[in-house]
């Protein structure tokens, strides 16, 4: 079945409401394998931050999960696809940046918290830049989530679990960078 971006996003949000666990990578893995999530695409602008919000809530973080996910979907749907290559900022990072802003309730007129999430986004973008391209929405999500887990622990005192990340999406990614990817699974061979 072919889904619109709105339908993909609605299914992601519905899945997050139902899923347990405090590991954003495991939440991502459970949802990213569904038919409504493509290998690459702007649904990641909703999915990546939604996994962080879900894990944060499940770990005891103080948010109204339904309202937070709806707000994230609104923000994520406003981000166009291919911003990584066209604007120089990755949608995985902006999605999680939006999730952090939702947790804090910050906006463009916030004073003391205004720049705090930029510390996260700049660190995550620096890590992505070091890996290089071409883009991979899965690899970028993994890097952005890893960076977010330590940020969330330091900023909010909420511990999210994070198991070692191993990518199983390589066979479906025609542009996989293989062993240059920090998450490449050896059984998928050299590229």
Model-predicted segments: where are they?
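Non-catalytic, interaction-prone regions of core transcription and DNA-replication machinery
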Residues: 2-28, 78, 82
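A structural-propensity feature for long, helix-poor, extended segments
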Residues: 103-153
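Cys/His-rich short segments
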Residues: 1-6, 170-171, 178-191
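C-terminal domain-closing interface element
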Residues: 139-168, 181
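Polybasic, low-complexity association/targeting segments
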Residues: 15-49
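Short, contiguous, pocket-lining structural segments
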Residues: 40-44, 48, 88, 136, ...
């Amino acid at each position: 079945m072919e889904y619109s971006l709105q339908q993909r996003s609605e299914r992601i949000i519905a899945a997050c409401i139902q899923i347990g666990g405090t590991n954003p990578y495991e939440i991502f893995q459970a949802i990213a394998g569904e038919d409504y999530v493509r290998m690459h695409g702007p649904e990641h602008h909703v999915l990546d931050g939604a996994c962080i919000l879900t894990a944060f809530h499940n770990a005891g973080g103080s948010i109204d999960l339904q309202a937070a996910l709806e707000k994230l979907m609104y923000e994520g749907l406003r981000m166009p696809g291919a911003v990584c290559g066209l604007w120089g900022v990755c949608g995985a990072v902006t999605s999680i940046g939006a999730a952090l802003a939702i947790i804090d309730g910050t906006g463009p007129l916030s004073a003391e918290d205004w720049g705090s999430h930029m510390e996260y986004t700049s660190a995550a973008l620096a890590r992505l830049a070091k890996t290089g391209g071409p883009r991979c929405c899965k690899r970028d999500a993994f890097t952005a989530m890893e960076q977010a887990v330590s940020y969330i622990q330091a900023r909010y005192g909420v511990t999210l679990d994070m198991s070692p990340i191993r990518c199983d999406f390589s066979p479906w990614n025609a542009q996989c960078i293989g062993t240059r990817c920090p998450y490449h699974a050896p059984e998928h061979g050299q590229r």
